[in-house]
């Protein structure tokens, strides 16, 4: 086991323990996009199941959105060699996106909604206890700043939440994992990564701008990324302007 994998194991098991993400006997569905993040999470979590750290039933779900150039042959081979239960489901969400999104606009919002809808549907149909997503430390801090700058809200990606209809529980075991470690791990493991030819080709994305902003600030103060993440668990309601929060404090 490499030093990088040990580091990933440490932060993933810490998040699972701190936020009570898994229970014995859980039937869980890990969403594998074909990118470095979900591949890294799968490899580590599978190892933790193999060495009996967690007693859970793992199923891997991949959504083939019918994008041009999609080739999952190597992904299938990887999953077969790993020996995990999996399904690659084909849904033509790409056609819907191309039809609905005006030329020049980014696809991310609609693509995300369609993908999320299929994930939730599949989880309910197969009676999954939990849905596992591969968002990491960097995703959380970028989402927080994006919410503040573009939506006027203080919110990000929680480690665990129940969907509005109460039907699905979503967990993110990599909230403490830094992207740079996942990049290194992907190189070490040589994962058969499938590039996204849809949103990956669009350069003017808000997330990329926010990511660069954080990187620039970190050049001046390396603690900036960790400080942003820590702020999500160090909230001072009395120092905010939310009337409902302030009223609840008074009462």
UniProtKB/Swiss-Prot annotation:
Instruction: Quote the catalytic activity from the record.
Output: cytidine(32) in tRNA + S-sulfanyl-L-cysteinyl-[cysteine desulfurase] + AH2 + ATP = 2-thiocytidine(32) in tRNA + L-cysteinyl-[cysteine desulfurase] + A + AMP + diphosphate + H(+)
Which pathway features in its UniProt record?
tRNA modification
Provide the alphabetized UniProt keywords: 4Fe-4S, ATP-binding, Cytoplasm, Iron, Iron-sulfur, Magnesium, Metal-binding, Nucleotide-binding, RNA-binding, Transferase, tRNA processing, tRNA-binding
What is the top EC class of this enzyme, as a single word? transferase
Note the superkingdom of the native organism: Bacteria
How the cofactor binds, per note?
Answer: Binds 1 [4Fe-4S] cluster per subunit. The cluster is chelated by three Cys residues, the fourth Fe has a free coordination site that may bind a sulfur atom transferred from the persulfide of IscS.
Enumerate the cofactors the protein uses: Mg(2+); [4Fe-4S] cluster
Query: What processes in GO biological process is this protein linked to?
Result: tRNA thio-modification
UniProt cross-references to InterPro entries, sorted A to Z: Rossmann-like_a/b/a_fold, TilS/TtcA_N, tRNA_Cyd_32_2_STrfase, tRNA_thiolation_TtcA_Ctu1
EC number in record: 2.8.1.-
* Residue ranges of the motif PP-loop motif: 33-38
Subunit-level organization: Homodimer.
Q: What else is known?
A: The thiolation reaction likely consists of two steps: a first activation step by ATP to form an adenylated intermediate of the target base of tRNA, and a second nucleophilic substitution step of the sulfur (S) atom supplied by the hydrosulfide attached to the Fe-S cluster.
Q: Which NCBIfam families match?
A: PRK10696.1
Its annotated function is as follows: Catalyzes the ATP-dependent 2-thiolation of cytidine in position 32 of tRNA, to form 2-thiocytidine (s(2)C32). The sulfur atoms are provided by the cysteine/cysteine desulfurase (IscS) system.
Can you say what this protein is called? tRNA-cytidine(32) 2-sulfurtransferase 2
